[in-house]
Amino acid sequence: MSRTILQPGQIEAAANIPPHLHQPSRDLFARRGERLLQLAEGHPMGDYLRLVAGLCRLQQALLDNPPALAPLDPERLRKSREHGMPPLAYDLLVREGAWLPWLDALLAGYPAPANAAVGAALEQLREAEEGQRKAWAIALLSGQFDLLPAALVPFLGAALQVAWSHWLLGLEEGAVVETESRTLCPACGSPPMAGMIRQGGKETGLRYLSCSLCACEWHYVRIKCSHCEESKHLAYLSLEHDGQPAEKAVLRAETCPSCQGYLKQFYLEFDRHADALADDLASLALDMRLAEDGYLRRSPNLLLAPGGE
């Protein structure tokens, strides 16, 4: 067995290298729900934000007390690590159906809704056959929102998110490795929902992309499009808020003229409580502004269908 002895300078350099990825905290959904309730106060979409906050509370309850599940295939996990592939590849796991008990548990735990449309959506999911549920899930995770009813999206997306976050938190250290694609989640292969500009210690100023499905965050250099990887002529757009200058805005969208896409970025320096999903839902006015300017949203939010609110 060969051994490498690090010299003092190498040890210091290694200690200053920021981690490639971060797992979500085990109270992710509880904190997200609290953030949504905070943002809902006086917001024109307050009712929807409160509905999603309720879903987040249910997600947290399921994460704390998960349904009975078969363990993930250890041989597949080994091969994924060996070949630099996402161990929780969503396209494969969705088709295998290991996430379906999470959907059943979420539907069983959701309180009787007063809203008739919500009740109808829940009933449609309950009555759907396994094949239909899988088809809807594939459509949602591949961004084909026109292939599933918009009213189903928040509930289907919530079940998928908590299932994948549970699996991610259960992986052994080192199971997730850097993959060839830096623009997709190294854990599950999903696109990012937003970028988080970190604040604190050696990570200050670094950007981590937040996965739309499993909530893994992975390091991605700044001033580089998270869709086409172009670095030229990127611009940053924010909405005026309480008279704050643009350079102190919590939210700024990074726009790319090469692919006409954009990604929202949240600067934790100015609000350490910002949450990728909650703050994204609360800032759809910025999406509308960007759409008017001809930019396309490349980052999905699994709890909202485009045009569905």
Swiss-Prot record:
Q: What is its main location?
A: cytoplasm
Q: Which UniProt keywords apply?
A: Cytoplasm
In terms of superkingdom, the source organism counts as Bacteria
Compartments in which it is found? Cytoplasm
Gene Ontology MF annotations: ferric iron binding
- Annotated transmembrane regions: none
For this protein, the record's CDD domains field holds: FdhE
| Biological process terms in GO annotation | protein maturation
Q: Which Pfam families match?
A: FdhE_C, FdhE_central, FdhE_N
Any one annotated GO CC term: cytosol
> Of which family is this protein a member?
Belongs to the FdhE family.
Role description = Necessary for formate dehydrogenase activity.
Protein name, entry field: Protein FdhE homolog
Query: What species was this sequence derived from?
Result: Pseudomonas aeruginosa (strain ATCC 15692 / DSM 22644 / CIP 104116 / JCM 14847 / LMG 12228 / 1C / PRS 101 / PAO1)
The organism's taxonomy opens as: Bacteria, Pseudomonadati, Pseudomonadota, Gammaproteobacteria, Pseudomonadales
